[in-house]
Amino acid sequence: MSKFNRIHLVVLDSVGIGAAPDANNFVNAGVPDGASDTLGHISKTVGLNVPNMAKIGLGNIPRETPLKTVAAESNPTGYATKLEEVSLGKDTMTGHWEIMGLNITEPFDTFWNGFPEEILTKIEEFSGRKVIREANKPYSGTAVIYDFGPRQMETGELIIYTSADPVLQIAAHEDIIPLDELYRICEYARSITLERPALLGRIIARPYVGEPGNFTRTANRRDLAVSPFFPTVLDKLNEAGIDTYAVGKINDIFNGAGINHDMGHNKSNSHGIDTLLKTMGLAEFEKGFSFTNLVDFDALYGHRRNAHGYRDCLHEFDERLPEIIAAMRENDLLLITADHGNDPTYAGTDHTREYIPLLAYSPAFKGNGLIPVGHFADISATVADNFGVETAMIGESFLDKLV
């Protein structure tokens, strides 16, 4: 019999809590990640007021220096710790896959200086369209169409860009490059990026409409991902007939593997929380696992090194946390964590190699306190333990610590 009928895992994308032990093996603009600290530096430089996460125990998580504006609770309402990454990567897919029990020993490739000429030339030859070379770099999806959409409307050239994650994205105005053609080009790009030196996690079609200065990305986005190389705990749950619900980009990250209810993409963190609340309220969701990703911290503020915006985004989540707690049933478990760091005060614009926080709350808790520091995959091991299924590759359950 399951200890908890339902477990809700919420990933605050990029909300790290201090440099990992191996952080100096990872760099940002040539600077090792060893001094990175997403929550610590936000708290120190612009202040952080997250009373609802603090009540659960955010300020109790062991650190060399306590979070400056998040006090430890003498009697928290839940359990807290921090978790270390084992896998050799600091991207979204690696973090999420490890959370679900995989050890990624060969990380995906990322292209901070843009894609090599060989890839662009192959796409040009296949499509019969030129590629705008100036867009070939890590770019905001809205900024890239603002900057190059007018040119695409005039010339029909392809807008190909990337991000901090191992993705190749192709933006195309629907009136200039029809959807069927865009999808066909993306399928070709997928076929040539399945092995090194260009092993990419996703190819993303990014269609848009409108006029210069007023472009809008449409819902016709399409992700061509790769499935995890080994069954995750999501697969184990699915095989056991236990419902799994994905909110936000979770379904894309796992290429649908092990997920039987995709609740759709988020338009924003707030929209994602709305979707989570809707999911939690489903009458048919009596037992199972929901997995939510809230990406605005990372996409809108971390990469853009906007500490004030990042702080405000954390405040907005914290203000809505009571709604999530109110939607919980007596035997629900809520786990709040992250997938990597992205210190908005740090060098460069890439993710940072950090510990991730873990907060655990349930209305059924009789106790509280700290869980021993562990690893990302301990989350999935705990989920597996609760529902009586096998773990994946790695992870140690902390279920017995939650009382």
Swiss-Prot record:
Reaction catalysed by this enzyme: 2-deoxy-alpha-D-ribose 1-phosphate = 2-deoxy-D-ribose 5-phosphate; alpha-D-ribose 1-phosphate = D-ribose 5-phosphate
Cofactor needs: Mn(2+)
Keywords (A to Z) from UniProt: Cytoplasm, Isomerase, Manganese, Metal-binding
UniProt cross-references to InterPro entries, sorted A to Z: Alkaline_phosphatase_core_sf (IPR017850), DeoB (IPR010045), Metalloenzyme (IPR006124), Phosphopentomutase_DeoB_cap_sf (IPR024052)
Entry EC number(s): 5.4.2.7
Binding positions (Mn(2+) 2): 298, 303, 351
Cofactor note as given: Binds 2 manganese ions.
Compartment(s) where it occurs, according to its Swiss-Prot or TrEMBL record: Cytoplasm
Binding site for Mn(2+) 1: 13, 339-340
Cystine residue pairs: none
Matches recorded under CDD domains: PPM (cd16009)
GO BP: 2-deoxyribose 1-phosphate catabolic process; 5-phosphoribose 1-diphosphate biosynthetic process; metabolic compound salvage; nucleotide metabolic process
Family annotation (Gene3D superfamilies): Alkaline Phosphatase, subunit A (3.40.720.10), Phosphopentomutase (3.30.70.1250)
Superkingdom assignment: Bacteria
UniProt main location, coarse: cytoplasm
Molecular function per GO: magnesium ion binding; manganese ion binding; phosphopentomutase activity
Pathway in which the depicted protein is active: Carbohydrate degradation; 2-deoxy-D-ribose 1-phosphate degradation; D-glyceraldehyde 3-phosphate and acetaldehyde from 2-deoxy-alpha-D-ribose 1-phosphate: step 1/2
GO cellular component assignments: cytosol
Keyword Secreted listed: no
Function recorded in the entry: Isomerase that catalyzes the conversion of deoxy-ribose 1-phosphate (dRib-1-P) and ribose 1-phosphate (Rib-1-P) to deoxy-ribose 5-phosphate (dRib-5-P) and ribose 5-phosphate (Rib-5-P), respectively.
Family label: Belongs to the phosphopentomutase family.
PANTHER family associated with the record: PHOSPHOPENTOMUTASE
The name this protein goes by in its record: Phosphopentomutase
